Amino acid sequence: MSTPKFQTGLFINNEFVDSLDGSTFDVFNPYDNSLLAKVSEAKKADVDRAVAAARKAFPAWAAMSPSDRGVLIGKLADAIEKDRDNLSLLETLDTGHPIRDTRNLDVMRTVATFRYFAGMPDKNEGTVIPVDAGFLNYVTRVPVGVVGQVVPWNFPLMFTSWKLGPALAAGNTVVMKQAELTPLSTLRVAELAREVGFPAGVINVVPGYGHIAGQYLAEHMGVDKVSFTGSTMTGRKIVQASAGNLKRVQLELGGKGANIIFEDANLDAAVNGSAFAIFHNQGQACIAGSRLMLHEKIADQFLDKFLKLAASIKLGNPLDPTTEMGPLTSKMHQERVLGFCKVAQEEGGEILLGGKIPSNPELQKGCFVEPTVVRSKTIKDRVCQEEVFGPFVVVSTFKDDAEVLEMANNTIYGLGGGLWTNNLQRAHLMARHMEAGMVWINCYKRFHPGSPFGGIKDSGYGREMGHFAMHEYTEPKSVWVNIDAKIPVFYPR
C-alpha cells in the first residue's frame, strides 16, 4: 500500500500551523484501530486566529470578479480530480469507506460539486422590482461575510465540497471545523486550494472537538453565519450558541428515512435499492432508508430476497477493491450500534439477520458490525424512532396507503424517504404528503449539485446545493433610486 500525502496542522491564512498550546489528537484507521496520525487540535485561541484571517481576507475576496472566483473554484475541482488516487486512499484509511466507493463516489462527487459551483459566481443574479413611478428599485445578493462551517465524520470529503463550494462562489470566506475523527481529506483539500492560488485567509480549516472548537465557532462574534451538519441534539446547541450576534444558521441534522415497498413494485429493483439505501457507507448516512415498510401482500417474498442479498454483502478490508462494506468510523460508534441491537431484543423485536460483530478473525480488531435486519414489535419502539446511524434496518408491514403514510410520518425527523410503486398517481400523492425534504420514487439516495438537499422538522432547516445554497450564503440588498419621482414636500415651510 502506498502512503497517502496529507497534512496534520491547522490551516490558517494559507499556512499549516500547530495549535497555539501544542495540543494534538489521535486519528485512527477504523479497519484495525491503528494510529494514522496525530493532528493539531484547534482551541478557542486557534479559532480566533482563523476568524481573524477570514475577516481580513473577506473584502478583497468579495470584491473579486465573480468569474475569477469561478476560475479558482474550477481549478480546485481539477486539482482534486488529479489527486484522486491519493484522496481516495486517504479517505478510506480515515473513514473506513471501501476504496471502490471513495474512488468512484466520494472523490468524483466532490469534483462534480466544485465544478458546479465554479459556474455559479456570475449567475448569482438580482432582480428589479416594479415599484412607484419615478423610482428604480433593484435587489442584489451580497455575501454574508465570514462563515463558520462544521463538517461531520461520515462523508468528510464530500461534505467539504457541499459547504465550501457555494460559500466561496457567493464571495464569503470560511472557517471550517472538521470532525476530530476524520480531518485528513479536508486538510488535503485546503492544501490543494493553496496550490491552485486561493488567497490567504479565504479558506481556513481548524480540526477539533465539537464541544470546544465547534461550540466556540458557533458563538464567535466575528462569524456571520454557521452551517452545521450533524446530530439533532448538537444542532440545538448550535442554535443556542449562535444567539449572541444573531448569526444566520443552516442545519442539516438527523433522519429516520421511511422506505416504502408497495405491492406493485418491481421487487428486484426495490430489493437492491433498499439494500443500497441502508447498507451503503455502513448505514452512516442521515438519509439512510432505515425504516423498511412492506406491503403485507409482498412482505414475505421481499424479505426472502432482501435477507439473502444482505447476507451476501462482503465485509472486509476497505482497501480491497472487492470489499462492499467496511467498518464503522469509530469504536465508540460501533458500540452504539451494537447497543441498539440489544435494545431491539429488549423491546421484543426479532433480529432476522446480523446484530453482532462478524466472526471473521481478520475483522476482529476493526469497528465492524454485520448488516442487521430487525422486525420491530411496534412503530413506537426506540429502534423505529431513534437514529441508529449504522447498517441497521427495521422492518414493518402495512395494509394500505393511508396506514403507511401515517407510519412514515410518525417520526420527529423529516429529511428523506422513498417509495417503490408502478402506480403513478399513488407515487405523486405519497410524495406530496410525506413529511420530508426529499422523496425518492423507485430509487433512493440520489442527489445532484443542482438539487436542494435538506429537511424539515427535527432534521433541520436551510438547504445545501444548487441556487438554494447560493441564497443561503447571500443576503438580498434592496437599493432605491429616485429617477424623476415627484416626492411631496413632507415639511412644507
Task: Please provide the spans of the model-predicted regions.
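Hydrophobic face of amphipathic alpha-helices that form TPR/SEL1-like repeat modules
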Residues: M1-Y31, K356
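Residue-level signal for inorganic ion chemistry
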Residues: N33, R69, E91, F114, ...
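ALDH superfamily catalytic-core signature
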Residues: M233-T378, A402, I441, P488-P492
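Glycine-rich loop-to-alpha-helix module at the N-terminal edge of alpha/beta enzyme cores
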Residues: S34-N124, G134
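Rossmann-like NAD(P) dinucleotide-binding subdomain of oxidoreductase/dehydrogenase enzymes
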Residues: E81, G126-A269, F398
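Structural signal for hydrophobic packing residues in well-ordered secondary-structure cores
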Residues: F58, A62, A77-R84, S88, ...
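Short, well-ordered beta-strand elements within core beta-sheets of diverse protein domains
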Residues: L36-A42, A57-A63, Q149, N259-F262, ...
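Conserved C-terminal structural/oligomerization subdomain of aldehyde/semialdehyde dehydrogenase
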Residues: S34-K38, I260, K314, C341, ...
